[in-house]
Each structure stands twice: as C-alpha cells, then as structure tokens.
Amino acid sequence: MLKGILEGCLLAVISKGETYGYEMIEKLEAHGFHMVSEGSIYPLLLRMQKEQLITSIMKASPNGPKRKYYTLTPKGQQELKDFQERWNLLSHSVNQLMNNKK
C-alpha cells in the first residue's frame, strides 16, 4: 500500500522545475522527509527514467562536476496526477479510521 509514496513525492518535486538529485533530497528534507538518502532516490530515479516518467540532461555546475537534471515527461505528469488521486483517497480513509472513536 505504501509502495510508491517516495516515487510520488519525487514526481511532485520534479514537477516544480528542473532539479538534480541532491537538491531533491534537500527539498524533501525541508518537508519533513529526513529518512530519505541518495541511496534511496537514485535507484528510483533510474527506474522512473526507464519507465519514461522523467528525462535527464547533464549540465555544468558552478561548484564542480556536471550534474544530472531531471524533468517530468507528459507520462510523468499523468502519473503524478494519478498518484495525487490515490493519495487523496488513502489519506482520507486513514484519517477516517484514526478519528473514529469506536
């Protein structure tokens, strides 16, 4: 059931604009996702790229080596929309269960 939550969150971060891996981790941490590491997001990014949900391009960095920047594809935008719908249903059900005093 919880499978795909991090993927959905990554899609949401990428949907805000072109971004690279470490920047995604920082953005997730800013929203309370302190358990996310490079080791957890890079395999997901690779899989999402293979599934054509995202694309990447290497760009020069002012602070060192080139960085791989990710953007959403139209398929990725649709997957994000689908994720948001699934999340809304799931969170509504969990909230109802948790607030039920019986």
Annotate the PLM regions.
Residues Q78-K102:
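Amphipathic alpha-helical dimerization/coiled-coil segments
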Residues L28, G32, M58-A60, P74-G76:
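Short, well-ordered turn and helix-capping elements at secondary-structure junctions
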Residues Y42-Q49:
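Short, hydrophobic-biased segments on the C-terminal half of alpha helices
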Residues K66-Q84:
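Basic, amphipathic "hinge/linker" alpha-helix immediately C-terminal to the N-terminal HTH DNA-binding motif
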Residues E51-K66, T71:
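Beta-hairpin "wing" of winged helix-turn-helix
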Residues K16-Y20, K50-E51, G76:
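Short, charged/polar surface micro-motifs in flexible loops or helix N-caps
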Residues M1-Y42:
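N-terminal helix-turn-helix DNA-binding core of bacterial DNA-binding proteins
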